[in-house]
């Protein structure tokens, strides 16, 4: 418990370094709310990473991975000025959680679709995260009893989520 408090404190300290390095600082209520959400999302990302590690026995009984994550965030505190990047990070962590859970044979199609959905949503926030589809296919081949329909689920999921996003853009902004 104390290590989570210290790591959360590290995230908050990194936030203050990121805000101090920002070229312009506004103290409007909207800006303060946005920055509070950013700090909450970063703490949530740390706790989500810890959950993924503990649930899938990635490391034994230590917190070095989340310590390294917090230290990397402290190395680049400008990440706090990019809320879309933090949101994409959370979506990638959620996709990683679903990919690692493919070892159990329950609801394999749902897990593959969920991972596809999270990667697609992350790519809407930050375009380069679409490359995580490269990780999804070897996981499908190696971690499941291979079925050819599993290969087409990410394609159908990506096209479905993208078509919903495009339809939303047409309705809301009247343009693509």
Where are these regions (language model features)?
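N-terminal membrane topogenic signal
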Residues: 1-11, 59
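Aromatic- and kink-enriched transmembrane "portal" helix at the membrane-lumen/periplasm boundary
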Residues: 31, 68-86
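Transmembrane-helix motifs of polytopic, lipid-linked glycan transferases
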Residues: 40-56
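Transmembrane-helix signature of polytopic, membrane-embedded enzymes
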Residues: 53-72
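Membrane-interface transmembrane helices that cradle and orient dolichyl/undecaprenyl
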Residues: 95-110
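Membrane-interface alpha helices of multi-pass inner-membrane proteins
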Residues: 111-125
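Perimembrane helix-loop-helix junctions
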Residues: 132-156
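Membrane-lumen/periplasm interface segments of specific transmembrane helices
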Residues: 153-176
